[in-house]
């Protein structure tokens, strides 16, 4: 209490530009304390009265006046806090509001404005929870471009309400510490039993000490609201049973599960990087780690074969991937075009659009327990005969039976297309059916790239036995631009450039990318081998054998550049090393929706470390977008990230061994 009085008096002198030594301040403080009455209870108001009297007795009239005004201002701040807390009916809210007043001192964030907005939302008969929700809504509605920090204030109010309800939930269940909560969630089938199987009671208690609830203040309202609705563990009646910090810790416990002697050290490193929001793991990792069905990978890519069984197998694969939160890329470049033959019957094939519509419906139907619908990108080669219809999949005009509004179309372009667009945009461009080429020429044109592809493409163009749908390059460019303006698609995938840079080109080729067009790995379709009938334990069973192909999987994380000290090389290297290790661990700890995915992921052990918050990073440093400083700064940052990632990956290879196909 004495320190508070001392600091308040010093601020009063500083505010008047008056210097005063610590000794004189201590003398004033001693006088204040000596003047206390032994019969009248000591209150904040009485102490402040004594401070005013002592300052004036010593001739510090201006300072005393400033102190009186400061005191009145503090009283006004207390009054508005108490009024809001009483109106909500939650006395514990007062401390949250006090912290808000301390951290957001600009006039535009005055709680008086919040009080006025809040009272306009209040209605007779509202429950305490409804009033708390109205208070949060008031802060959200005060958020503007001129006052953006109201979103952080709204987040604190939302977090307080959530924590109060969460504490009541656990109190009602008679559960106290973190170990007890994890045991309860495990027994209810909401938490993976592997966590408590790998960690002792003492280790969970140690992990609980890592928790930093104050890091909840890093959230914006929209971020926290999304986290509470989609990511924290909920009961089957949709009641959140996990705090954001417990979520981060649960993810860290999962990702460090197989670490050795320094396992708890890695738990803390993983927790710190996540809870400080320096690194964001992919959505499936954030959502599914620590849960019974712990599918951690974001991205999958499948090569759709040109057969009925193969197409429906790919649809089934997509449904299973989507069920557990994965996004999908599907390459349709092998599927025969509309009007092609089926078993020699002319004009029997319906083309890729019909199958893509099934993909669209699957994405909508398999919606992850109602959380969000599936997400899929469908890829087609720029020379496929169905390309014009494909480019109109999401546009609003035309036959609705040829539309698929919930998929993301993407086109795989060879270098030849862009070369013609640059040199002679009116040049003819020939669209052909891959099945017809395979039947007539004996090879699959899509299985080649670069100069070899160009040679075979021209060979097909000059073969009169192959039907062509001839347009100009300009026609295709026009369709692409029209679709891009209306829908933001198609995505572009430059297949020759990608395959030239393929580090695993010695073992295969890349046909397309994933939903986000940021991963590129060897692909091959799943092949049916046989279907046989066996007898097992007296029962008749049908066994289907398949060759797994290359079902692409990638585990992703993102460095949040706006929250990182990118100039600090040592800190950045440590952060990147931590993220790389977490991603590598995810490969072994993953629950795979398909065995095909597990085989490919463990063969290539592919990971993807990206960035977010790029513009935030520049804005915080006052770096103009259109400047040489921007380019130089960005080069330095990404060189550091790349170096740190390669260094961390090399260290992992020395520790655990290289991946099977490395050359």
Question: What name fits each language-model region?
Answer:
Residues 1-663:
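Extended catalytic cores of very large enzyme megasubunits
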């Amino acid at each position: 209490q004495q320190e508070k009085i001392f600091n308040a008096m010093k601020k009063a002198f500083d505010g008047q530009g008056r210097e005063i030594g610590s000794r004189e301040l201590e003398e004033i403080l001693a006088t204040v304390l000596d003047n206390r009455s032994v019969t009248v209870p000591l209150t904040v108001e009485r102490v402040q009265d004594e401070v005013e009297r002592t300052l004036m007795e010593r001739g510090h009239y201006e300072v005393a006046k400033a102190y009186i005004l400061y005191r009145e201002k503090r009283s006004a701040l207390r009054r508005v806090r108490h009024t809001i807390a009483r109106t909500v009916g939650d006395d514990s809210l007062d401390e949250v509001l006090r912290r808000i007043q301390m951290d957001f001192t600009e006039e535009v964030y005055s709680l008086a404005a919040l009080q006025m907005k809040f009272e306009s939302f209040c209605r007779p008969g509202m429950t305490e929870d409804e009033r708390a929700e109205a208070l949060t809504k008031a802060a959200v509605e005060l958020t503007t471009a001129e006052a953006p920090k109201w979103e952080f204030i709204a987040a604190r109010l939302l977090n307080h309400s959530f924590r109060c309800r969460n504490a009541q939930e656990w109190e009602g269940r008679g559960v106290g510490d973190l170990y007890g909560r994890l045991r309860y969630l495990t027994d209810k089938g909401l938490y993976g039993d592997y966590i408590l199987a790998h960690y002792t009671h003492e280790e969970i208690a140690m992990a609980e000490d890592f928790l930093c609830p104050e890091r909840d203040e890093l959230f914006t309202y929209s971020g926290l609201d999304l986290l509470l609705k989609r990511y924290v563990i909920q009961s089957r009646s949709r009641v959140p049973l996990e705090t954001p910090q417990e979520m981060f810790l649960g993810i860290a416990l999962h990702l460090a599960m197989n670490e050795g002697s320094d396992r708890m050290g890695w738990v803390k490193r993983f927790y710190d990087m996540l809870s400080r929001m320096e690194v964001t793991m992919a959505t499936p990792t954030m959502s599914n780690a620590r849960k019974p069905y712990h599918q951690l990978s974001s991205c999958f890519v499948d090569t759709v074969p040109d057969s009925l069984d193969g197409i429906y197998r790919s649809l089934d694969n997509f449904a299973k991937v989507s069920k557990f939160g994965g996004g999908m890329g599907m390459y349709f470049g092998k599927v025969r075009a509309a009007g092609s033959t089926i078993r020699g019957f002319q004009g029997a094939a319906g083309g890729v659009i019909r199958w893509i519509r099934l993909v669209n419906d699957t994405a909508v139907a398999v919606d992850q327990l109602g959380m969000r619908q599936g997400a899929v990108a469908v890829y087609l080669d720029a020379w496929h005969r169905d390309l014009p219809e494909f480019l109109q999949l999401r546009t609003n005009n035309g036959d609705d039976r040829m539309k698929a509004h919930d998929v993301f179309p993407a086109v795989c372009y060879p270098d030849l297309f862009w070369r013609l667009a640059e040199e002679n945009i009116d040049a003819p461009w020939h669209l052909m059916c891959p099945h017809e080429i395979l039947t007539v020429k004996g090879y699959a044109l899509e299985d080649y790239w670069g100069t070899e592809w160009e040679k075979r493409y021209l060979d097909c163009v000059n073969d009169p036995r192959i039907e062509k749908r001839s347009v100009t390059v300009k026609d295709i460019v026009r369709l692409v631009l029209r679709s891009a303006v209306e829908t933001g698609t198609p995505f572009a995938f430059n297949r020759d450039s990608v395959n030239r840079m393929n580090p695993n080109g010695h073992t295969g080729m890349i046909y397309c990318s994933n939903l986000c067009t940021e991963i590129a790995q060897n692909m091959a379709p799943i092949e049916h081998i046989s279907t046989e009938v066996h007898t097992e334990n007296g029962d008749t069973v049908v066994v289907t054998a398949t060759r797994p192909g290359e079902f692409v999987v990638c585990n992703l994380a993102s460095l949040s550049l706006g929250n990182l000290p990118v100039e600090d090389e040592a800190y950045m290297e440590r952060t990147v090393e931590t993220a790389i290790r977490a991603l590598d661990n995810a490969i072994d700890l993953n629950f795979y929706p398909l065995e095909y995915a597990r085989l490919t992921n463990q063969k290539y052990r592919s990971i993807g470390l990206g960035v977010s918050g790029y513009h935030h990073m520049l804005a915080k440093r006052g770096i103009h977008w259109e400047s040489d400083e921007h380019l130089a700064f960005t080069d330095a940052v990404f060189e550091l990230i790349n170096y740190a990632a390669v260094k961390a990956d090399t260290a992992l290879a020395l520790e655990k061994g290289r991946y099977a196909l490395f050359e």
